[in-house]
Amino acid sequence: MEDEEVAESWEEAADSGEIDRRLEKKLKITQKESRKSKSPPKVPIVIQDDSLPAGPPPQIRILKRPTSNGVVSGPNSASRPALPVKSLAQREAEYAEARKRILGSASPEEEQEKPILDRPTRISQPEDSRQPNNVIRQPLGPDGSQGFKQRR
């Protein structure tokens, strides 16, 4: 580039053919580089053709997870140990024991026999002192006016 002559304007460079020579030189260089870099594609491209029958679908296998000791359990073997069947009397005894441990009483009947004193009793009003249901109230506004019935 140092030995090349630089034209004063692009018009002089075009007239002398300098632009054409430079373009041809750059074009040759890029063509040589593209030839060198051309190599077979590294990944083969598979084009599917619908006319050919597809292969069989892939096999799907369901694997069983091994148990804690490393042995795969069969479909008929129970994963949990069988619980012994308890009689009604045994279940009621366990229930009473748990209830006594948690609530402090062994049977629910003890609780129902005691009157509940925690709740206040309802005081019934005599029928005469109650207000009749047919009373129509007129609401008053904050300033003592007739409220909603006031006309403007």
Swiss-Prot record:
Residues 111-152 form the SUZ-C domain. The modification N-acetylmethionine is found at residue 1. The keyword Phosphoprotein applies. Residues 30-86, 99-152 are annotated as: Disordered. Residues 66-79 have a biased composition (Polar residues). Residues 42-107 form the SUZ domain. This is SUZ RNA-binding domain-containing. It comes from Bos taurus (Bovine). The gene is SZRD1.
